[in-house]
């Protein structure tokens, strides 16, 4: 049994705080949307499993070790004939982060439907979380994602997470809409809704298929729309924090929402925890390093600059 199962690619990451071509110090870590969510949910006290493949190499072992250290059950296949993906972050200016991928043909792109369905059968997860990144990696990874959502009785969430460098908007829309009939909760930024609905009112359209649509809009906050006899719409503003690095904020938001879902909290409380987790993430560099524990969740109620003694 596991509370949450997620699947997808995690890469070794290198980050510099200036243009990378200038050299100098760099930080080595790991990065991947699904593992970011896994770490966030695990830090909030839940049992979490992450399924993927990595190369039989040192970057792959770094990923496994890091996730295990974060109390995530890392179900990893080490591939001898494929490599661990790589991602680089650099900053051409203080408030702009540039991302470079090296992931085509990576080990994670070889994830198979048999692997995902076997994990679901073994683990009987309460929730399954998928993103639009995994099916963009390869036809095999797309089939693995579809198999996961089609063969489970668990509640499934989907984060659209469109990546233009991985596939076109047309290809993304076709695959994401194939997933939708099996999805309970959809997460999307306000500029991604057209990928999953052509309707003039995409929220109303989506709520004919899914139970909940959560829309994020950066500094404007987030909205949750739930299918009820009288459709329930909730808004939460972005919390007032000093933004250092926004990379990973969406994954942090999702992790807070899924944790609150596992705790059977109200739609309002789910959005509150999601907003809090997202706010924590942007206060430091890194995709996941500043994600909160359960004890941390109340810290942002203190005034900025407070010293807790």
Please report, for each region that a protein language model flagged, where it lies by residue.
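Conserved phosphate-binding/catalytic region of the ribokinase-like
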Residues: 1-5, 199-309
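Ribokinase/PfkB-type carbohydrate-kinase core domain
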Residues: 1-6, 68, 93-232, 296, ...
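Glycine-rich phosphate/adenosyl-contacting loop at the front of the ribokinase-like
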Residues: 1-72, 308-309
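Short beta-strand scaffold segments in enzyme catalytic cores
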Residues: 39, 86-90, 221-225
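Short phosphate-binding/catalytic loops that engage adenosine nucleotides
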Residues: 46, 72, 154, 211, ...
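Beta-strand->loop->alpha-helix junctions that form or flank phosphate-binding loops
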Residues: 53-55, 74-82, 214-216
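A glycine-rich helix N-cap at a beta->alpha junction
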Residues: 64-85, 92
């Amino acid at each position: 049994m596991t509370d949450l199962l997620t699947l997808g690619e995690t890469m070794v990451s290198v980050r510099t705080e200036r243009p990378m071509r200038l050299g100098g110090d760099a930080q080595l870590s790991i990065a991947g949307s699904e593992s970011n969510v896994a770490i966030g949910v695990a830090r909030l006290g839940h049992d979490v499993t992450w399924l993927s493949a990595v190369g039989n190499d040192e970057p792959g072992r770094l990923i496994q070790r890091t996730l295990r250290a974060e109390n995530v059950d890392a179900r990893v296949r080490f591939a001898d004939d494929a490599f661990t993906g790589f991602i680089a972050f650099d900053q051409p200016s203080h408030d702009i982060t540039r991302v470079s991928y090296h992931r085509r043909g990576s080990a994670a792109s070889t994830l198979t439907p048999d692997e995902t369905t076997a994990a679901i059968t073994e683990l009987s997860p309460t929730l399954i979380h998928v993103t639009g990144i995994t099916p963009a990696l390869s036809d095999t990874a797309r089939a693995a994602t579809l198999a996961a959502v089609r063969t489970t009785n668990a509640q499934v969430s989907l984060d659209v997470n469109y990546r233009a460098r991985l596939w076109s908007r047309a290809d993304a829309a076709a695959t994401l809409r194939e997933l939708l009939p099996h999805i309970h909760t959809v997460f999307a930024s306000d500029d991604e809704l057209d990928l999953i609905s052509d309707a003039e009112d995409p929220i109303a359209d989506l709520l004919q298929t899914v139970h909940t649509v959560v829309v994020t809009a950066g500094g404007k906050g987030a909205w949750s729309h739930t299918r009820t006899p009288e459709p329930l719409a909730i808004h939460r503003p972005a919390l007032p924090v000093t933004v250092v690095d926004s990379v990973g904020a969406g994954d942090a938001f999702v992790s807070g929402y899924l944790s609150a879902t596992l705790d059977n909290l109200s739609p309002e409380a789910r959005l509150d925890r999601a907003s809090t987790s997202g706010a924590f993430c942007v206060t430091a560099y890194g995709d996941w390093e500043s994600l909160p524990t359960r004890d941390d969740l109340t810290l942002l109620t203190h005034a900025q600059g407070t010293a807790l003694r």
